[in-house]
């Protein structure tokens, strides 16, 4: 698979076909797009495969950069498949329903590899072979938020259109990414609203979470989960998440993700420091790795839940504290001297304060799990030097058929 730097940049002028722009994308790029060029413009295309010739409807412009959707395929790639969703590519939720899932994984691996090489090659950091964890690409989400609105008297319920706040109604059969229980719950809610047995919701969103096979309100109820994971023996762990609290959204990959983290974290640590600890799920799975565990999280509700979760699993010597890692420093030298760090930040990546602390403290090693590979690699490029090696990179496809994916990296000091 060619990178965009290797592909030939067309110097041809823009061609118009049936009132649409005729383009030939040359490579895959981040965020689910392929890229095409004219003499002066660059185009990012949804629903287009490199090598195809496509009629394009432009949706967004910023200077010489354009974003659009391939509406008709004039020259079809052998890699193209028929979409299994009637609202793709109009719906902004999915990016890869025009290729097989195996091809999607290849594309995501290629994009991660290219980003790593772009940021780290100048520092002569050796990049290990990328591993992939994946599961069933259908019905995987345990949380969902549907956009609500009206077009005249017609009720709209679905996801936003690409580059728009126009709502695309869900297909009658529901969203392929959602469990059938959740699709049924959304449909039933709207049916009852039409009948008048439910008051018309004034909110602009409708959010649910899946607890086993039961669908509950995302913002109004806490939820309980359990998983059997090998750490290394098979063990059942249980945890709760407060109403509105964060959880990993892929119900099929929580156990494999935790097992991979367990595999990568070294044994017999004197203390593990976890930043952005959420409700304590990683601590529950990995407490046997260390005599002491300390986690920091901005949400006081999540911190209190993390303390309850370790007790639910009969675990001691774990503590969790509320701290805004964007604005506040960790002021304990003892804590900063923890032998291993684990970080699972939001999409924006590590805060400047955390990154500065990491560089100053230079721990023996750390694990970084992120749903934004661009900010992860950016942070790595600022930290990695001749004293450290990148010993593992694992792509965890938490978000099949979409432009997103999770990445776990392990960094450790050289011998």
From Swiss-Prot:
Its EC number is 2.1.1.-. GO terms for molecular function: 4 iron, 4 sulfur cluster binding; metal ion binding; rRNA (uridine-C5-)-methyltransferase activity. InterPro entries: MeTrfase_TrmA_AS, NA-bd_OB-fold, SAM-dependent_MTases_sf, U5_MeTrfase_fam. It comes from the Bacteria. [4Fe-4S] cluster binds at residues 85, 91, 94, 175. S-adenosyl-L-methionine binds at residues 248, 276, 297, 344. One of its GO terms (biological process) is rRNA base methylation. The active site is at 371 (nucleophile). Keywords: 4Fe-4S, Iron, Iron-sulfur, Metal-binding, Methyltransferase, S-adenosyl-L-methionine, Transferase. PROSITE patterns: SAM_MT_RNA_M5U, TRMA_1. Belongs to the class I-like SAM-binding methyltransferase superfamily. RNA M5U methyltransferase family. This is Uncharacterized RNA methyltransferase LIC_10086. It comes from Leptospira interrogans serogroup Icterohaemorrhagiae serovar copenhageni (strain Fiocruz L1-130).
């Amino acid at each position: 698979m060619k990178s965009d730097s290797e592909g030939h940049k067309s110097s041809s002028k823009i061609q118009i076909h049936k009132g649409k722009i005729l383009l030939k994308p040359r490579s895959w790029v981040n965020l689910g797009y392929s890229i095409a060029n004219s003499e002066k413009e660059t185009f990012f295309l949804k629903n287009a495969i490199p090598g195809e010739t496509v009629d394009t409807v432009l949706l967004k412009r910023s200077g010489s950069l354009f974003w659009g959707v391939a509406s008709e395929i004039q020259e079809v790639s052998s890699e193209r498949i028929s979409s299994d969703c009637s609202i793709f590519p109009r719906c902004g939720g999915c990016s890869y329903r025009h290729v097989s899932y195996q091809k999607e994984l290849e594309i995501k691996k290629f994009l991660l590899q290219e980003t790593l090489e772009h940021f780290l090659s100048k520092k002569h950091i050796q990049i290990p072979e990328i591993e992939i964890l994946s599961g069933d690409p259908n019905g995987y989400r345990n949380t969902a938020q549907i956009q609500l609105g009206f077009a005249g008297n017609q009720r709209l319920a679905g996801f936003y259109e690409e580059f728009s706040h126009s709502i695309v109604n869900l297909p009658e059969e529901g969203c392929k990414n959602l469990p059938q229980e959740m699709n049924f719950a959304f449909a039933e809610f709207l049916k009852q609203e039409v009948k008048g047995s439910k008051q018309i919701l004034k909110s602009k969103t409708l959010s649910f979470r899946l607890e086993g096979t039961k669908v509950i309100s995302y913002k109004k109820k806490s939820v309980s989960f359990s998983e059997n994971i090998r750490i290394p023996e098979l063990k059942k762990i249980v945890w709760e998440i407060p109403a509105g609290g964060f959880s990993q959204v892929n119900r099929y990959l929580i156990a494999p993700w935790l097992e991979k983290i367990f595999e990568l974290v070294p044994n017999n640590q004197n203390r593990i420091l976890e930043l952005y600890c959420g409700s304590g799920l990683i601590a529950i799975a990995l407490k046997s790795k260390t005599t002491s565990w300390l986690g920091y999280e901005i949400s006081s509700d999540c911190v209190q839940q993390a303390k309850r979760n370790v007790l639910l699993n009969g675990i001691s010597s774990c503590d969790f504290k509320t701290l805004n890692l964007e604005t506040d420093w960790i002021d304990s030298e003892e804590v900063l001297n923890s032998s291993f760090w684990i970080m699972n930040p939001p999409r924006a990546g590590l805060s400047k304060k955390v990154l500065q602390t990491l560089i100053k403290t230079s721990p023996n090693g750390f694990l970084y799990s992120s749903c934004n590979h661009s900010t992860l690699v950016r942070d790595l490029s600022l930290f990695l030097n001749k004293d450290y090696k990148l010993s593992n990179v694992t792509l965890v496809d938490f978000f099949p058929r979409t432009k997103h994916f999770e990445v776990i990296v392990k960094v450790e000091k050289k011998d």
